[in-house]
Amino acid sequence: MNEPLISDISRTGRKGYSLNSSDLIRTPHSQLIPGKFLRQSPAELPEVPESEVVRHFLRLSTLNYHVDKDMYPLGSCTMKYNPKINDETCSLEGFAALHPMQPESTVQGALQLMHELSGMLAEITGMASVTLQPAAGAHGELAGILLIKKYHEAQHSKRTTLLVVDSAHGTNPASAALAGYTIVSVKSNGIGRTDLNDLKEKLNGDVAALMLTNPNTIGLFEKEIVAIADMVHKNGSLLYMDGANMNALLGITRPGDMGFDVVHLNLHKTFSAPHGGGGPGSGPVGVCEKLIPHLPVPVIEKRATSEGARYHLTGDCPDSIGRMMNFHGNFAVLIRAYTYIRMLGAEGLRRVSENAIINANYLLSRLDGAYSLPYPKPVLHEFCLSGDLQKKSHGVRTLDIAKRLLDYGFHAPTIYFPLIVSEALMIEPTETESRETLDRFADAMLQIAKEAEECPETVLAAPETTPVRRLDEAMASRQLNICCR
């Protein structure tokens, strides 16, 4: 289906809605708005009747791929099914009708929810305290790195380098650079984990912290994490964990118990809020005891009064890094995460991670052999295959495999990441997929491997069933044009 732009179905004189003349403001625009802000010519808005507007956007909605339609195996993105009760709770009038500038006395329920959520996340991660302000994962990274920087400044220690493991989450180096640090990469060893010898060589008095993801983006748990923490702390550095893959650890182990000083979470991933397309997200940051004075303001405090518990926002934190954003984070995502945790409880959260690990290993067991496995199994919640076999033997790249998968009705996995895996296919099935769905996906991947061997031209020409076939993605990136005309 080739759906035209709404501007292309516009016809002069057609109307979708007419304003009643009694609703119109009688005062001339020039008296209400400064002239420099007024248009000199009419806006080129499409003239389309209501029926065509509804049909246009309904047709577009059927072209969208989302987790309510089928499995969404993007590695390191945790595209799990989002329970609809989460939407029910954040749509309650007491939450949905709030304004962030209301008096504190009128938002006690919202403050209580945030205070309790912060406490639950601290318990889940084993950290001393958690801030909910950051709006997404990379924003949480930046907050965590600024906390590290503030800590060293308070210790009168000027450290300018951050170590980042090459299997860490992709935004880590960018966040570190934004905070003004020089980034030094730490290598992985032959089994996909941090190379302790390389780490030892690169630790020195200029290193502020080591950033790593655990489990890493290959889906492997850093078994030497206690030794890593010991090495880092003996150097006077801090240990930062990117919690992008926390879906593998719930109720099983905690970052704080491993020795991490800072961890950020992705509530929209691990704790189930719809995400993709740029948001919305939430990236809370948990810290150890010595970093609490530097947390962003305002901080929510619970105080006992004659009327019972009351919640207050306080900015009386002289050593804080300050605000990370206006108001207090993406509140609707916080409500969804709170609901998710309360519905599942401690036992349910552990089952989430156990099932995510089982699903990933089952799927890997079906695909291992048809595709190259760069590092040994077992894995945790996700795994990384390589399309090297198909590329070298049949000229079929990972990109071609991903495009062909669209013809089988599935969203493609994450491709070409992590960078330490050639022709990478990173797959995360999550805990919410049934065995039947996993088998359908595995069957499609196995059929594509067979096609690559027997009729590679079919894979090279894919996709064939999608409304739009292959886009020139390189040109789109280099010659950005978002204008419809």
UniProtKB/Swiss-Prot annotation:
Which reaction equation describes what this protein catalyses?
Answer: N(6)-[(R)-lipoyl]-L-lysyl-[glycine-cleavage complex H protein] + glycine + H(+) = N(6)-[(R)-S(8)-aminomethyldihydrolipoyl]-L-lysyl-[glycine-cleavage complex H protein] + CO2
How does the record describe its quaternary structure? The glycine cleavage system is composed of four proteins: P, T, L and H. In this organism, the P 'protein' is a heterodimer of two subunits.
User: From which residue to which does any coiled coil extend?
Assistant: none
UniProt keyword annotations, A-Z = Oxidoreductase, Pyridoxal phosphate
Kindly list the positions at which N6-(pyridoxal phosphate)lysine occurs in this protein.
K269
- The enzyme class is oxidoreductase
Protein name (Swiss-Prot/TrEMBL): Probable glycine dehydrogenase (decarboxylating) subunit 2
Q: What is the organism field in this record?
A: Chlorobium phaeovibrioides (strain DSM 265 / 1930)
Q: Give the top-rank taxon of the lineage listed in the UniProt record for this protein.
A: Bacteria
Instruction: State the EC number(s).
Output: 1.4.4.2
Q: Which family does it belong to?
A: Belongs to the GcvP family. C-terminal subunit subfamily.
CDD domains tied to this protein: GDC-P (cd00613)
Primary role: The glycine cleavage system catalyzes the degradation of glycine. The P protein binds the alpha-amino group of glycine through its pyridoxal phosphate cofactor; CO(2) is released and the remaining methylamine moiety is then transferred to the lipoamide cofactor of the H protein.
Known PANTHER family for this protein? GLYCINE DEHYDROGENASE (DECARBOXYLATING), MITOCHONDRIAL, GLYCINE DEHYDROGENASE, DECARBOXYLATING
Q: Which InterPro entries does the record associate with it?
A: GcvPB, GDC-P_C, GDC-P_N, GDC_P, PyrdxlP-dep_Trfase, PyrdxlP-dep_Trfase_major, PyrdxlP-dep_Trfase_small
- Cofactor(s) the protein requires to work: pyridoxal 5'-phosphate
Q: Which GO terms describe its cellular component?
A: cytosol; glycine cleavage complex
Q: Name one Pfam family in it.
A: GDC-P
The record's listing under HAMAP family reads: GcvPB (MF_00713)
Q: Name one GO biological process term.
A: glycine decarboxylation via glycine cleavage system
